[in-house]
Amino acid sequence: MTVTCASSADKIMQAATELFASNNFDATSIKDISKLSGVNSALISYYFGGKKNLYQEVLNNQSVLFLDLIEQVNKQKLSAIMKLHLYTKEVALIQMQRPMQVHLIYRELLTPSGFCTNFVQSRLYKIHQFLFDLVSEGIEEGCIKSSVQPTYVAFTIESIIVFFFLTQNFVRELGSFSKDNENEYLENALNSYLDSIAK
């Protein structure tokens, strides 16, 4: 692919990510994506085969960030509880830098488009399984309380992250947080929970 072609495809992806995140699949048209990207609408079909394929590619790109993070955390020679702390710190950073990720992925669960639900669920399952495995490992290591249920811990961590980003503006106003302090707030919330299950 030439530099020009790559640039056009990237512009389409960037525009589509922004529009799908701020609106949704049905409310976003090829014309909207073409206008925002500055790329001829015919090229959207050329590169991605239409709006549905483009939507799935956008979702895939967003989920890859989290799957790559899981791989990197798993490579670290740390205790399970420290891996959980590292994961929550890094995922908070990713989502503060790229807040559209949460809106895209979780909107598909809340208001399914009908053709990507299984795709998104499979990615979320991998994240859940990763957290479940770490908690189970932590119990075996003796660094996490044996009384906790791994799947409940995984759901709680996921819920803290998702709730914060889906209600971000309300939380910011209620807690009088500035944008600069939001990442610190989320890290502290997650760390407080992890501290409560650690031995």
Task: State each model region's role.
Residues 96-118, 167-173:
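Amphipathic alpha-helical segments used for helix-helix packing
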Residues 82, 118-123, 140-156:
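All-alpha amphipathic helical-bundle segments outside canonical DNA-binding/catalytic cores
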Residues 86, 90-93, 97, 125-141, ...:
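C-terminal peripheral helix-coil segments that are non-catalytic and often amphipathic
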